[in-house]
Amino acid sequence: MKQSEYFADVMQKNHVIAADEYELYQYSLNALFEMAGNIIFSILIGVLFHKLPMTLLFLMVVIPGRSVLGGCHAKTAGACFVLSLSVLFGCVLLPFYLTGISVWIVSFSFIILEVLLWIIAPVECKNKPFIGNQKKRCQIYSKVIILLLGALFMAFLFMKMSEYLLEIWLILVYFSVTILIELHKKTSF
């Protein structure tokens, strides 16, 4: 039995929720546990690799960014967990090894990707479709996320914090790749 089912059962037996609310609470608790587990596991990775500030930055940017910008999403929670951790490792650990890349190349590609996302985001995924007026809200929020990414990039550029600059750049590359993959899927069929 899943934890979410156990807690929903306890809530129903103690008359905290009605029988017709069981599935909603079970689903909500499952989502809560998955999200909390991902965040806690990510923070532990940040602590173990001595990259906690970069991990927290990653979480603060990627969680709202992926929710708003769209793009391809994994079909299962397990696949999402593995892919998310892979992206976390890439965005947090790779900048240390990429500090030799020209700031001009990174900046130029960052601007191109920002313009690309500004034009095409958000992109709906069949595994996570927009509901109701969510697309309209996501269009507005995606512009805010893109502007915030640009502001963070500029701040790290002027403060000469190359690892953080590269992390923001890698996150933008990640967002762009997931969106382009989803667009390719839509045009291929």
Q: What is the predicted role of each segment?
A:
Residues 91-104, 146-162:
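Hydrophobic alpha-helical transmembrane segments in multi-pass integral membrane proteins
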Residues 100-115, 169-173:
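Alpha-helical transmembrane segments
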Residues 125-148:
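Membrane-helix boundary/juxtamembrane motif in polytopic membrane proteins
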